């Protein structure tokens, strides 16, 4: 009888700890929702700059500005990175 009671209490304690940890993880993920927008904007500006600089370098070397593919679904167009 004591073994069964100890097993039930142990399972209950593990369940409570697991549930609490899962709730804390969910709350921390919800708090970070706004962060990716600012990081994404910085990446967009960086790609725009890299693409326009690479086009300018090609123009100065007496070559036409080719439509280079930027990384991550972006394309170089009119000296700007444009989302494809």
UniProtKB/Swiss-Prot annotation:
Molecular function terms, GO-annotated: toxin activity
Signal peptide boundaries: 1-22
Domain of life: Eukaryota
Protein family: Belongs to the neurotoxin 12 (Hwtx-2) family. 02 (Hwtx-2) subfamily.
Protein name, entry field: U4-theraphotoxin-Hhn1b
Keyword Transport: no
Tissue specificity annotation: Expressed by the venom gland.
Keywords associated with the record: Disulfide bond, Neurotoxin, Postsynaptic neurotoxin, Secreted, Signal, Toxin
Its biological purpose: Postsynaptic neurotoxin.
Proregion residues excised on maturation: 23-47
Disulfide bridges in this chain: 51-65, 55-76, 70-81
Family annotation (Pfam families): Toxin_20
UniProt keyword annotation of Electron transport present: no
GO cellular component terms attached to this protein's record: extracellular region; host cell postsynaptic membrane
Source species: Cyriopagopus hainanus
Compartments it resides in: Secreted
């Amino acid at each position: 009888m004591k073994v069964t009671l100890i097993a039930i209490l142990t399972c209950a304690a593990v369940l409570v700890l697991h549930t609490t940890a899962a709730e804390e993880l969910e709350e921390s993920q919800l708090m970070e929702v706004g962060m990716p927008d600012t990081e994404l904007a910085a990446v967009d500006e960086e790609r725009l700059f890299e693409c326009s600089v690479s086009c300018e370098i090609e123009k100065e070397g007496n070559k036409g500005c080719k439509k280079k593919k930027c990384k991550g679904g972006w394309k170089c167009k009119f000296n700007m990175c444009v989302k494809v």
